[in-house]
């Protein structure tokens, strides 16, 4: 089983750790966070306002974090090059601080003995992979990769199915996105993005997102054909993508539903979900799919112009894909 170190024990770091234990696919052997001491790690991992209490056991013992009787080495280094990943047995590092997102910065982990790094965020220059979409293009020569964003992980599987079956001429995406840690609880300063500084719990906030353009990086045929924006809304978790696109090949809405359902039961099983139920956002809290197509929420204006709706737990689904990407990379060693 591949041994993993987690850098940054924030929301995604903790949920990747949960996903590792829940799935049993990878073994977390080390965690680094200079801002969270060991006892606080125990508390933060045990209790989660969104996903509930961890169902296993968590404790601190002899300077180590023990989760389900598994011993995890804890570091508190600010400089990634100072973390002794090799000593702890970590071969792969999940870079989830949100700070070291370039190839150069993420590569600092390699100095401490790690073999490869997966950035749990979009990257300006690291190759981006979306499991179920382009993960097969991963090559063993790559040391640092990005798992893209939660929104790209929702949009890309849907866009791939539509493009493969009907062809996308052009598209606009809107994500109605739960608030995240980058936002303010009450109005405050926010650099050049003034709207982003408004109270997250009080407002629907129009915001930018690179998620749609990033789809062009993971599906080259769609490069320059899709762009999008976000509305940040006052909910703590679960977001939804609205993809409005013009199709090359005319298709009835039922044909589109059938193509997505087939993909969800076949090549994209576990990645792309499908529902015809009368669902709302909280119904997807804890869902491990990257994207769950809502068959009854979409509409077609005609056979070439459609609006498609797909849900995602922007924390849980994404964290599970980080684990899946690590597993896929390890299988190529």
UniProtKB/Swiss-Prot annotation:
Q: Name the NCBIfam families on file.
A: GAPDH-I
Q: What Gene Ontology molecular function terms does this protein carry? A: glyceraldehyde-3-phosphate dehydrogenase (NAD+) (phosphorylating) activity; microtubule binding; NAD binding; NADP binding; peptidyl-cysteine S-nitrosylase activity
Q: Highest lineage ranks of the organism?
A: Eukaryota, Metazoa, Chordata, Craniata, Vertebrata
* Binding residues for NAD(+): 11-12, 33, 78, 120, 314
Q: Name one Pfam family in it.
A: Gp_dh_C
**What are the residue positions of the site described as Activates thiol group during catalysis?**
177
The annotated active site, in chain numbering, is 150
- Identify its protein family: Belongs to the glyceraldehyde-3-phosphate dehydrogenase family.
Stated name of the protein? Glyceraldehyde-3-phosphate dehydrogenase
Entry's Gene Ontology BP terms: glucose metabolic process; glycolytic process; microtubule cytoskeleton organization; neuron apoptotic process; peptidyl-cysteine S-trans-nitrosylation; positive regulation of canonical NF-kappaB signal transduction; positive regulation of type I interferon production; protein stabilization
* Catalysed reaction, written as an equation: D-glyceraldehyde 3-phosphate + phosphate + NAD(+) = (2R)-3-phospho-glyceroyl phosphate + NADH + H(+); S-nitroso-L-cysteinyl-[GAPDH] + L-cysteinyl-[protein] = L-cysteinyl-[GAPDH] + S-nitroso-L-cysteinyl-[protein]
The chain residues annotated with the modification S-nitrosocysteine are: 150
Report the function annotation for this chain.
Answer: Has both glyceraldehyde-3-phosphate dehydrogenase and nitrosylase activities, thereby playing a role in glycolysis and nuclear functions, respectively. Glyceraldehyde-3-phosphate dehydrogenase is a key enzyme in glycolysis that catalyzes the first step of the pathway by converting D-glyceraldehyde 3-phosphate (G3P) into 3-phospho-D-glyceroyl phosphate. Participates in nuclear events including transcription, RNA transport, DNA replication and apoptosis.
Keyword list (alphabetical) reads: Apoptosis, Cytoplasm, Cytoskeleton, Glycolysis, NAD, Nucleus, Oxidoreductase, S-nitrosylation, Transferase
Q: Where does D-glyceraldehyde 3-phosphate bind?
A: 149-151, 180, 209-210, 232
Q: What is its EC number?
A: 1.2.1.12, 2.6.99.-
What is the top-level taxon of the source organism?
Eukaryota
Compartment annotation: Cytoplasm, Cytosol; Cytoplasm, Cytoskeleton; Nucleus
Query: What organism does the UniProt record list as the source?
Result: Xenopus laevis
């Amino acid at each position: 089983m591949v041994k993993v170190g987690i850098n940054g024990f924030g929301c995604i770091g903790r949920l990747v750790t949960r996903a590792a234990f829940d799935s049993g696919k990878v073994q977390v052997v080390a965690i680094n966070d200079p801002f969270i001491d060991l006892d606080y790690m125990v508390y933060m991992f045990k209790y989660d306002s969104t996903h509930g209490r961890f169902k296993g056991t968590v404790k601190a013992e002899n300077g180590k974090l023990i989760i389900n009787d598994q011993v995890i080495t804890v570091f508190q280094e600010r400089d990634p090059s100072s973390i002794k990943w090799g000593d702890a047995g970590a071969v792969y590092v999940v870079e989830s601080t949100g700070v070291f997102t370039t190839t150069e910065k993420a590569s600092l982990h390699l100095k401490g003995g790690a073999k490869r790094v997966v950035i749990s965020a979009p990257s300006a220059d690291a190759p981006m992979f979306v499991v179920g979409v382009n993960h097969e293009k991963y090559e063993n020569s790559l040391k640092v990769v990005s798992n893209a964003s939660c929104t790209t992980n929702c949009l890309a599987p849907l866009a791939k199915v539509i493009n493969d079956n009907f062809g996308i001429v052009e598209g606009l995406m809107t994500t109605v996105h739960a608030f995240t840690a980058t936002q303010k609880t009450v109005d405050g300063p926010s650099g050049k993005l003034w709207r982003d500084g408004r109270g997250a719990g009080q407002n629907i906030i129009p915001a930018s997102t690179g998620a749609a353009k990033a789809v062009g990086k993971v599906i080259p045929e769609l490069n320059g054909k899709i762009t999008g924006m976000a509305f940040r809304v006052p909910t703590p978790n679960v977001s939804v993508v609205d993809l409005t696109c013009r199709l090359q090949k005319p298709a009835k809405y039922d044909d589109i539903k059938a193509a997505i359902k087939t993909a969800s039961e076949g090549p994209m099983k576990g990645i792309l979900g499908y529902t015809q139920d009368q669902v709302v956002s909280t119904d997807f809290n804890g869902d491990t799919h990257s994207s769950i197509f809502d068959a009854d929420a979409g509409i077609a204006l005609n056979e070439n112009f459609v609006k498609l709706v797909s849900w995602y737990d922007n924390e849980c689904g994404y964290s599970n894909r980080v684990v899946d990407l690590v597993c896929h990379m390890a299988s190529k060693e």
